[in-house]
Amino acid sequence: MKNSLKILCSESFTSVSAPVQYAAVEAYRGDHSTYLNGVNKILSFTANYVYENLKSNLINISKPEGGFYLFPEFTNAKFLSSSEMCKDILDKTGVALLPGSDFGLDTARMIARLSYTDFDGAEFLSNTLGRKKLDKADLEKYAPNIVYGVSKLKDWSN
């Protein structure tokens, strides 16, 4: 009986139910290009802002190509592990990063995963949707935690 129940639960809880699948088909119909272009514009601008502001402060960081994360390496940080470094950053700046070792990177390298999505995306999008370009004032208004966090990381890394 236990084995039968495990099989039943596996089929019930590991797949999306049929009603949800049908709803998704309806939700994905239509042209979503305006939304997607707006979201891509915001994420690209935010990622490049973080990159441009951190790369000049003894931080090795790859130019963003998409996604939601950057992996800065703090070359002047002297800790035994990236976990220890991330704890120090959190304690001293209030900025939360995940250690690179959590993602299979060498624990001795001072690499962390940084998410640049700490903002209300719906608000940001609705207020900038018709615009061709974004600027720092947009980040200060709609993503102030990003601007603040980058500033704190720059100060910490010096």
What are these regions (language model features)?
Residues 1-158:
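PLP-dependent class I/II
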